[in-house]
Design a protein with these regions (language model features):
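Short catalytic-loop micro-motif centered on adjacent basic/acidic residues
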Residues: 197-201
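A generic structural motif
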Residues: 51-54, 166-173, 223-229
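A short, acidic, amphipathic alpha-helical segment used as a generic capping/interface helix at domain edges
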Residues: 7, 72-77, 179-189, 205-207
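Long, contiguous secondary-structure blocks with strong helical propensity
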Residues: 137-147, 196, 243, 256-263
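Electropositive, gly/pro-rich neighborhoods at or near active sites that engage anionic ligands
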Residues: 1-161
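C-terminal functional extensions of proteins
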Residues: 205-264
């Protein structure tokens, strides 16, 4: 059975040893898209399939997926999910997240045509591993060339490492900024970039950037970090929806800060 801490150690070791790899995440949003369910995050509500509820989402978190309009993006996401390649790691949801449950974990395994060595935890860098991400992994970025796919509202000037190239995206970026994946791939090819780390904080667009980029060139590392750096980027949405972040940065006592995900 896969182990949450050991899986983190594996990626950390690869970064320390400058062994290039890709880590792409299929969290709950990607799960719903794969399942062909409507997905909307708006200012004060969300829709997932037939379920509508209230929550607060700031502009950088807004997204929309309507099955009747956006099948080409779902098809691309399926392609990224089904793809297998050496050192191409795909994080999926587990039943440890109550709103996901074992039924959806089993669904993802089945949709993937079975478990695989390259499947891992979508939450690998967050929850109980988040403190290690901040304190052990982020310092390793200082000595690496960093490319960053990040929201246009983010202020990257306070990050503890330098960014050599930034690719800015807006709201609903999977659809509105679909072409960024090609731009990242072309930039790497044209500049001869090698042994850089490409950080992605671009919702489901991250899956496209990482898949296209690593499939084309395995000489760089592609890392989907989601909202992990948002407290350092001057963004506010994490304070309302990310317990692992409020637990670490605001001492909120959120149980997500202690959650060790289990492979089931």
């Amino acid at each position: 059975m896969k182990d949450f801490n050991a899986a983190f150690d594996s990626l950390l070791s690869k970064i320390k040893n400058k062994e290039n790899f890709a880590f792409t995440r299929f969290s709950d949003g990607e799960l719903f898209i794969l399942q062909n369910k409507t997905l909307v995050l708006a200012d004060n509500y969300y829709i997932t399939g037939d379920i509508k509820g209230r929550n607060r989402y700031t502009k950088e978190e807004h997204k929309e997926f309507y099955p009747e309009q956006h099948q080409q993006y779902r098809n691309k996401l399926i392609e990224t999910f089904k793809h297998n390649q050496n050192n191409y790691f795909k994080g999926i949801c587990t039943s440890t997240d109550g709103h996901v449950g074992k039924q959806n974990f089993d669904w993802m395994i089945d949709f993937h045509d079975g478990d695989h060595n390259n499947l891992t935890f979508a939450n690998l860098l967050i929850n109980a591993n988040y403190s290690r991400f901040v304190e052990e992994m982020v310092p390793l970025f200082i000595d690496r060339e960093i490319l960053y796919v990040v929201n246009e509202l983010a202020d990257t000037s306070k990050l503890p490492f330098e960014i050599s190239k930034k690719f800015e995206i807006g709201s609903n970026c999977m659809i509105e900024d679909y072409g960024i994946a090609e731009k990242v791939k072309d930039y790497i090819r044209e500049t001869g970039t090698k042994d850089a780390i490409v950080l992605c904080s671009a919702a489901s667009l991250s899956n496209f950037v990482i898949y296209d980029g690593f499939d084309d060139n395995q000489d760089n590392t592609f890392l989907d970090i989601g909202s992990c750096l948002n407290p350092l980027l001057g963004l506010e949405g994490w304070k309302y929806t990310r317990g692992y972040l409020t637990g670490y940065w605001l001492n909120s006592g959120s149980p997500f800060q202690r959650q060790v995900d289990v492979w089931s």
